[in-house]
A protein has these predicted regions:
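NAD(P)-binding Rossmann-fold cofactor-contacting core
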Residues: 21-39
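Rossmann-fold NAD(P) dinucleotide-binding segment
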Residues: 45-86
Length: 104
């Protein structure tokens, strides 16, 4: 399964390491704000690269906060991607909208 991570802070880097330990998961892209030499070959600052990459099965939002997480998650769902998040603020604010998008 090909995964894109949105964020590479404490949570994102931990999810990245966990995915690397699994043979069935492949982190294809990581959306970053600042340079991360350890993931330079898969890092991007352009969310559109993730959105339009048909090989990406799942987008994992690990950035936290409401914005731009909301915009990224809704765009990914509208593009037909599966989305995983543990962002409590995002879910609390937009639960009904996000679940409706996910069901489409």
């Amino acid at each position: 399964m090909n995964i894109a991570l949105l964020g590479f802070g404490v949570v994102g880097s931990g999810v990245y390491e966990w995915c690397r330990s699994r043979e069935d998961l492949h982190v294809r892209r990581v959306l970053i704000r600042s340079d991360k030499p350890e993931i330079a070959s898969i890092a991007t600052r352009d969310f559109e690269e993730i959105l339009h990459d048909n090989a990406i099965d799942v987008v994992a939002e690990v950035m936290g906060g409401l914005h731009p997480a909301y915009e990224y998650v809704t765009a990914a769902l509208k593009a037909g991607k599966h989305v995983v998040t543990a962002n409590k603020a995002l879910i609390a604010a937009y639960y009904q909208e996000l679940t409706a998008l996910a069901r489409q």
